[in-house]
UniProtKB/Swiss-Prot annotation:
<feature type="binding site">
    <location>
        <position position="271"/>
    </location>
    <ligand>
        <name>carbamoyl phosphate</name>
    </ligand>
</feature>
<protein>
    <recommendedName>
        <fullName>Aspartate carbamoyltransferase catalytic subunit</fullName>
        <ecNumber>2.1.3.2</ecNumber>
    </recommendedName>
</protein>
<feature type="binding site">
    <location>
        <position position="143"/>
    </location>
    <ligand>
        <name>carbamoyl phosphate</name>
    </ligand>
</feature>
<dbReference type="GO" id="GO:0006520">
    <property type="term" value="P:amino acid metabolic process"/>
</dbReference>
<dbReference type="GO" id="GO:0016597">
    <property type="term" value="F:amino acid binding"/>
</dbReference>
<dbReference type="GO" id="GO:0004070">
    <property type="term" value="F:aspartate carbamoyltransferase activity"/>
</dbReference>
<dbReference type="InterPro" id="IPR036901">
    <property type="entry name" value="Asp/Orn_carbamoylTrfase_sf"/>
</dbReference>
<feature type="binding site">
    <location>
        <position position="65"/>
    </location>
    <ligand>
        <name>carbamoyl phosphate</name>
    </ligand>
</feature>
<dbReference type="InterPro" id="IPR002082">
    <property type="entry name" value="Asp_carbamoyltransf"/>
</dbReference>
<dbReference type="InterPro" id="IPR006130">
    <property type="entry name" value="Asp/Orn_carbamoylTrfase"/>
</dbReference>
<feature type="binding site">
    <location>
        <position position="66"/>
    </location>
    <ligand>
        <name>carbamoyl phosphate</name>
    </ligand>
</feature>
<dbReference type="GO" id="GO:0006207">
    <property type="term" value="P:'de novo' pyrimidine nucleobase biosynthetic process"/>
</dbReference>
<feature type="binding site">
    <location>
        <position position="146"/>
    </location>
    <ligand>
        <name>carbamoyl phosphate</name>
    </ligand>
</feature>
<dbReference type="Pfam" id="PF00185">
    <property type="entry name" value="OTCace"/>
</dbReference>
<dbReference type="GO" id="GO:0005829">
    <property type="term" value="C:cytosol"/>
</dbReference>
<comment type="subunit">
    <text>Heterododecamer (2C3:3R2) of six catalytic PyrB chains organized as two trimers (C3), and six regulatory PyrI chains organized as three dimers (R2).</text>
</comment>
<feature type="binding site">
    <location>
        <position position="272"/>
    </location>
    <ligand>
        <name>carbamoyl phosphate</name>
    </ligand>
</feature>
Length: 322
């Protein structure tokens, strides 16, 4: 990876997942996101690259931070941004996702950002509309921009991703964040571990090129990055953990468990956090935490994704307005 030249061109119409992206595609987005950071830190946080373009955010699942991040990203690029409130939409009256897609397509948007509880919803939408589609999370399938912002955060702090030991800990079973991160980190040459109780591990982990641990002590040993996952109790249909208190005792990241990792290990969390469940407050707010940097990198990455998809200089085959 280190000797390959990264092209400024992004040869995709949609961003539906990390799966399907080459390592060079990923690096293209990360390199562009570096440039977007500078824009966000200027007094006038604005570019005109997407002036005249229309972005519709279609969130079937509530997510204040992700939706706000996409909205801010679009506005900083100069796009006209519309947030569609699903709670007040025809979806609540029985309209299907395909019906919604056809209706939105008739409005001639340039890009649709969708979050949905069903895996594959973004891919289905992409088949039905004439504009670009960005997956902001579909069920337990993927969350590509979260993985990209995590990679950007790691790369800025550590200078590289290749050969780093990254431990992903917690509710892996229900986590689209874990899946996308595993795909991306493997693509860029990291050594990926997952740490979780057996009840929170999906089948087939061995096929994803990761090391699996049921012990935090073993899984965090010499880790460069500790990525905690939220315990997603709203997605749990059965009894996956005996109690929240017991879960924190064995799998919550506190100062004592963090000592198993390298002294300069990064602490990450995609948010929202359950303090005292998967992570202790003094660790979340401690000197090794880069959780707030992840939020900042999220805006930069989403700016990069939309610019890569819609700017004709970066995507000649997909750069004309819809």
């Amino acid at each position: 990876m280190t000797n390959q030249t990264v092209s400024p061109l992004f040869p995709h119409r949609h961003l539906l997942g990390i799966k399907g992206l080459s390592p060079l595609d990923i690096l293209c987005l990360l390199d562009l996101a570096y440039q977007e950071i500078a824009v966000s830190r200027q007094p006038e946080k604005k570019k005109s690259v997407l002036r005249g373009r229309t972005q519709i955010n279609l969130f079937f699942e509530a997510s204040t931070r992700t939706q706000s991040s996409f909205e801010l990203a679009g506005k900083r690029l100069g796009a006209d941004v519309m947030n569609m409130s699903v709670g007040n939409s025809s979806v609540k009256k029985g309209e299907t996702l395909i019906d919604t897609a056809m209706t939105l397509n008739a409005m001639q948007p340039d890009i649709l950002v969708i979050r949905h509880a069903s895996a594959g919803a973004a891919a289905l939408l992409a088949q039905k509309v004439g504009c670009s589609v960005v997956n902001a999370g579909d069920g337990a399938h993927e969350h590509p921009t979260q993985a990209l912002l995590d990679a950007l955060t790691i790369r800025r702090a550590k200078g590289q991703i290749e050969n780093l030991i990254v431990a992903i800990c917690g509710d892996v079973l229900h986590s689209r964040v874990a899946r996308s991160n595993i795909l991306l980190l493997n693509a860029l040459g990291a050594r990926v571990r997952v740490v979780a109780p057996s009840t929170l591990l999906p089948a087939g982990m061995a096929d994803m090129s990761v090391e699996v641990f049921n012990s935090m002590e073993e899984g965090l040993k010499d880790a460069d990055v500790v990525m905690m996952l939220r315990l997603q109790r709203e997605r749990m249909a059965g009894s996956f953990v005996p109690s929240v208190r017991e879960y924190f005792h064995f799998y919550g990241l506190d100062r004592e468990k963090l000592k198993f990792a390298k002294p300069d290990a990064l602490v990450m969390h995609p948010g929202p956090m359950n303090r005292g469940v998967e992570i202790a407050s003094d660790v979340a707010d401690g000197p090794q935490s880069v959780i707030q940097q992840q939020v900042e990198m999220g805006v930069a990455v989403r700016m990069a994704v939309m610019e890569a998809l819609l700017d004709p200089r970066r995507n000649p085959g997909n750069g004309e307005p819809a």
